[in-house]
Every structure is written in structure tokens, then in C-alpha cells.
Amino acid sequence: MKKTTQLYEGKAKKVFLTDDADLVIQEFKDDATAFNNKKKGSIAEKGVVNNAISSKLFTLLEAQGIRTHFVEKLSDRDMLCRYLDIIKVEVVVRNIAAGSLVKRYGFSEGTVLAMPIVEFYLKDDDLDDPLMNEAHAVALGVATLEELAFLKNRAEAINVLLKAFFAERKLKLVDFKLEFGRHNNEILLGDEISPDTCRFWDLETNEKMDKDRFRFDLGGVEDAYSEVQKRVLDLD
């Protein structure tokens, strides 16, 4: 399968059309951004690492009945995916208080939440991806109530599977972002699952092992991404 026309370029990936109208190629970049593109930089080999991690996790979820856009890993940076009509809703699942949840509600960072919190954000960079509820989403025409209920249920199911997977590899899944899209009258999980889209803390030390190291200039970004890759792929 070969790339034809570039369909889209985002902060972390490029998407290309192929000769098959149902399939696209997602190319992972090393570019890094934070705070809705206000901070920009690069993380060496990030695209390679994130493609490897995402491919493994999509395969895991597919085996557990979670339908995704993933078809196969084509190369170090390229992933073959089903074409999606992206739903403009970012779904965030939170297990431990961190990031904007701490700022909004005054939680102490690291507080284990009584139950996972599922949040919806409007996928719109110009508006800084604002938090929204179901009524906002319906009023904006980005999803129906039935679709939003499906997204919430699917996100909760993914959380159960991923929390257990990462715990076995001595990682806390603090929170993570999911994106979904429509494909042939079906809603599939899209985008990626990686240290770009998840917060990972070491199970024993609580060391941050994700893009927060880039966001807050903590150093050791490449090493953290590489360590997550080793644990996810069981590369001891």
C-alpha cells in the first residue's frame, strides 16, 4: 500500500490517501506541541516510538472486541488505517487527578479518583478545545446523544483494559485522550494511544513518563518515551 495525496497534517501526524478509498496511511512525526500549540519542539524518534506503542495497543484492544481504525503497522513511522470521518469530540478519561483537573477543581495532584471521570471536549484548536457536556455537543451538531453514550461506554471499557495492561508493566494510567470516527455506519477508535495522548506514571516512584516531561521542561523526554515503549512491547 502506497501513499498518494496528503489529506491532512496535524501536530503529531500526517494522513495520506491511498489507492483504496477505505484506507489511509497515518505517518507519525517527531514534532511535539503543548498548551494547544503554544509550545513547540521536537522529540527525537517520537514518531517511531508512538507508532510502535499505538500499533501494539490497538492490536490488544481489537483482540478484546474494541473496534479501531488500525489495520497494520507498515513501517517504523507508517500505520495503515481505515478512513474515518472524525467526530469532533475529544474523550478524556481520568483515573488520577493531574493536569487541568487539578486546576479546575482543586484536587491535589496524584489523588486517586473515587471513580473514573469521563469528559468531553470540543475538538477545535481555535477555541482551545473547550470542555463541554452532552447538550453542548448536540447543540453544536458534532454528535447525537446516542453517539455520546456510545463514546462514554466505549471509553470506560477501554480504560478497564488499558489500566490492567499498564499495571502489569508497572505503569499507572493517570489519564488519556481518545478520538473516534465514523466508518461505514460504525464508530471506531482512531488517532493514537501513546505518551503523547496518555499520562503515565511509574507505579513505584510516580515518575512522569509522558509528554508532561516536554510540557514542563522536566528533561529526559526521549528516555521516558523509550522506557514506555520497552514496557509496552515487553522488551526487557
UniProtKB/Swiss-Prot annotation:
- Determine if Secreted is one of this entry's keywords: no
* The EC number(s) this enzyme carries: 6.3.2.6
The reaction(s) catalysed by this protein are: 5-amino-1-(5-phospho-D-ribosyl)imidazole-4-carboxylate + L-aspartate + ATP = (2S)-2-[5-amino-1-(5-phospho-beta-D-ribosyl)imidazole-4-carboxamido]succinate + ADP + phosphate + 2 H(+)
For molecular function, the Gene Ontology terms on record are: ATP binding; phosphoribosylaminoimidazolesuccinocarboxamide synthase activity
What pathway is this protein a component of? Purine metabolism; IMP biosynthesis via de novo pathway; 5-amino-1-(5-phospho-D-ribosyl)imidazole-4-carboxamide from 5-amino-1-(5-phospho-D-ribosyl)imidazole-4-carboxylate: step 1/2
Identify the Gene3D superfamilies for this entry. ATP-grasp fold, B domain, Phosphorylase Kinase, domain 1
The protein's UniProt keywords, in alphabetical order, are:
ATP-binding, Ligase, Nucleotide-binding, Purine biosynthesis
CDD domains registered for this protein in UniProt:
SAICAR_synt_PurC
Any GO BP? cobalamin biosynthetic process
The reply on keyword Nucleotide-binding is yes
Task: Tell me the domain of life.
Answer: Bacteria
Q: Give a Pfam family name.
A: SAICAR_synt
Q: Which family does it belong to?
A: Belongs to the SAICAR synthetase family.
- UniProt name for this protein: Phosphoribosylaminoimidazole-succinocarboxamide synthase
Identify the species of origin: Pelodictyon phaeoclathratiforme (strain DSM 5477 / BU-1)
